[in-house]
Structure formats: structure tokens, C-alpha cells
């Protein structure tokens, strides 16, 4: 079998609601996620030596067991007793530490690619079980698209509707620790997001209701730590974006626009204000 290439799209949160804290210390989340056409690419091929060889065009990334792609390959290799090696190339295009699920999407793409390369014939449930050992975002990233995600991330329900929109992404120069943000959550006072209403809006194709029901429970916490996030949001809205919202625990902010002309205005307004700006579309 020849080399296999899988794309690993970034994701954004149209809605993120914190529903409470679990006895195990994790938080129960309900999210609406959608993929965008900013993608990494994973290429896998057979290797005669019995080892995992991971390389990348991004020198910032570890290429050992600290990388989620490597973890995915190791878990599959051990579980199914694969006696040959594999070479994996990660073509990195999604910003690192951006809150867009880049690492999780890379791991998911590696699982899909290795499932083909090694002819494992894994069921969706088996892939999800492997993915959850790597990270809570991996199950969604295995299937991508537009979906509602609940629990710790392991329950993924596709949404019967399609959001076709231009998206402007801004990745500030700083990162944010997800663990720190979740540590500061007060479930009694945190802002809530009407996820079920958001899902209904997408299913009905009601763009205005979509905008009215979008939100992120973590946004206020992250903005308190990094006020620049609010400045980016303000800049986007002032230049004509339909909505501006932080994705995940940040720091990336995105704007939705119905037309490319509108998206171009938002992009132009950010020149000289932010270095990493991307104009993409929802998938």
C-alpha cells in the first residue's frame, strides 16, 4: 500500500457551555463545534525498521511521545501488536497552542490514516476509545463537521444542518493554559450558553438566531487574564463582523461573515494589529 494522506482541519466553538463539575474533577461540557478549511496534513507510510518515525515542518513541535500524533501511533501499534514500523510526516499549518484543536485533529487524522495503512478495520467506537486516551477533543476530530459534543468530549452527535460562512481567525502572540482557565471556573456564576437553541438554529438554517444563541462560558475568564482578547473582538465588530467570539479556552478569536467582501474588511482592519490572521470557510 502506498503512503496515505489525511487532512486535519482546525475547529471553532460556536457554543461552549459549562454545565457543572463532575466527581472526577472534570467539567461537564456541552459544545457546538464546526470545522474550518485551515488544515494540517498527516502522511503515513510503512517503515522497515520497527519504530515510529515522526517528522514535521514545524520545529516547535516535539517529535516523540510528547506529541499526540506519536501517542496515537504508539497506542495503535501496541494494542494491535503491529510488528513493522511507520513513518509519519506532520505538515503543520494550523497555529500551535491556539485553542483550535490542532493537536487533537492531528491525532485523529493519524488514527484514521493508520487504520487504513495497517488495515485494522476499526469501528467508530474503537477509534473513539483510542482517541479518548489521547485527549477529550480527539473523538470529535475523528469525524469533524458540525456537531454537538457532550460529556468529557466522548459523546459526538452530528447536527443536521450546515453553516456556510466565512470565518476570520486571529491568533494572538500569547498562549493560554487551558488548565488554568478551568481551575478558575465558578459553576454558580459562570455565564451559560443555550446550546439546544443554538443546535435548533443551525438545523433550521436561521443565521440570525444562530448569532443570538452563540456564546462561550470560558470567554470572561480568559479575557480577565488577557484583555487583548476583548480588543480583538471589538476590532472585528467595528469593521463589520456579524459576531466575534473566542474559541475554546482561547486565545484565538474568530469572526463570522456572510460574504467574502465583509470578511476582507475584517482582515484589513486587523493589519498591523495582529500578526496571525486567517480568512477561511466552514466545512
From Swiss-Prot:
GO biological process: terpenoid biosynthetic process
Alphabetical keyword list: ATP-binding, Kinase, Nucleotide-binding, Transferase
Active site: 11, 137
Keyword Nucleotide-binding: yes
EC number from the UniProt entry: 2.7.1.148
Keyword Thylakoid: no
Reactions mediated catalytically: 4-CDP-2-C-methyl-D-erythritol + ATP = 4-CDP-2-C-methyl-D-erythritol 2-phosphate + ADP + H(+)
GO molecular function, one term: ATP binding
Chain residues that bind ATP: 95-105
SUPFAM superfamilies per the UniProt record, alphabetical: GHMP Kinase, C-terminal domain, Ribosomal protein S5 domain 2-like
Similarity comment: Belongs to the GHMP kinase family. IspE subfamily.
Entry function: Catalyzes the phosphorylation of the position 2 hydroxy group of 4-diphosphocytidyl-2C-methyl-D-erythritol.
Protein name: Putative 4-diphosphocytidyl-2-C-methyl-D-erythritol kinase
